[in-house]
Amino acid sequence: MKPGKKIIRVAAMAAAVVLLLGGVSLAEGFLLGEEGTGATVKVAENTSLNVRITLQGRLDAGDLIKSDEATPTSYESESDFSFRRIRLAFTGNMVKNLTYNLTIAADKNSVAPGNASNTLRIWYAWVNYKFADPLSITFGKIKLPYSRVSLTPATKQLLIERPFSTEAAKTLFDDYIQANLSLNGKLAGGTIAYSLAAADGWEPGATVSGNRVHKSGLLYLGRLELSPPGWVEKSKSDAALGKGRHLTLGVNAAAQNGIEYASNAFEEDRTLWGADLSGHWQGLTAQVEYNAWKEDYSDPSKVMKEPKGWYAQVAYFIPGVNVEPAIRYEIYEQDSNKSDTEQRTITAGINWYLKGHDVKLSANYARTEFEKNANGFLANDDKQNIFQLQGQMMF
């Protein structure tokens, strides 16, 4: 049996098992009870501390490695067990309207087997002061405000992995989660929401495009979200578990100019813009997002690079059995200034919620096809098939 067909058969069997087992929870609510909020200690009237632990165990199988040759020509099957995410989060209020978060992570650093070192590091560290709904200020190590699917917590993703294009866009300004200062607010009952931020981006000493950075301008970012009255999302989630409704249009832009190299007189500018539309009504959820970015070099030996990509995903939460089949289609053009650099990915999956997002099991099958000039294309193999199983627990 061909590897691709074998993976599809295993995925189908896993989905059938989930549906079968889900039948034991036909009663209202989740099999293991409702979602929790972690452990909270209230020190004083406006002072509190909440502690949450997140664990994501993962099995990846399929075309995970390349052939053992000087120049690989095909993909080979392999499997890999890992803890994709291990998080310990401390969140609370120091005084009224002053919120803080410190998250320690020991995530797996790569989805490829053999590259998994669960290195302990600070993931988030920020403080936020809310003056009023229209204005709050945040400083610390936190996500940069662009890309809807990237801003959504990993624990509330619809599918196990985020799209390739948005993952690539997250590296445009060095770390996606970096120290930044932002102004945020909501107007008109949340129908208008905004975020304006400034960060270092590529800073002195970092290596960008093969060159060490001497100095650079600041990175500026902005995001705007618009929702109709009565359709405002309380917090970002790919999967609302059949509750409520929302409809949100988001647009974002970012730019960092004057990234000067230390070894020569050249420099580069980087810009990004994107738009997304997301919505859900009870069990039905859908989302589409587009991002395009540019790396503009003053070095005449380098050609301006302009990647772009989009995806669309849809799912339906089935109450009673508490399962959610989902599908996503994506096109990522690695450089629109070159021909045949597209990769197309279709991902099909199913989630089984035993305690909402606190305890859930997910199974995904992803198939990617590469054009001849795209990274990932091999002489004897232009397709990659991967099957994933993941269990998530938060407490």
Describe each model-derived feature in a short phrase:
Residues 2-12:
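Bacterial N-terminal signal peptides that target proteins for export
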Residues 11, 21-27:
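Sec/Tat signal peptide C-region and signal peptidase I cleavage site
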Residues 27-34, 208:
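Cleaved targeting-peptide boundary
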Residues 34-204, 214-230, 238-243, 306, ...:
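Outer membrane beta-barrel
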Residues 202-304:
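Surface-exposed beta-loop-beta
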Residues 219-231, 382-395:
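Outer-membrane beta-barrel "beta-signal"
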Residues 289, 324-328, 349-351, 358-366:
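Conserved active-site loop/cleft motifs that coordinate metal ions or position small ligands
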Residues 355-389, 394:
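Predominantly the C-terminal beta-signal and adjacent terminal strand-loop region
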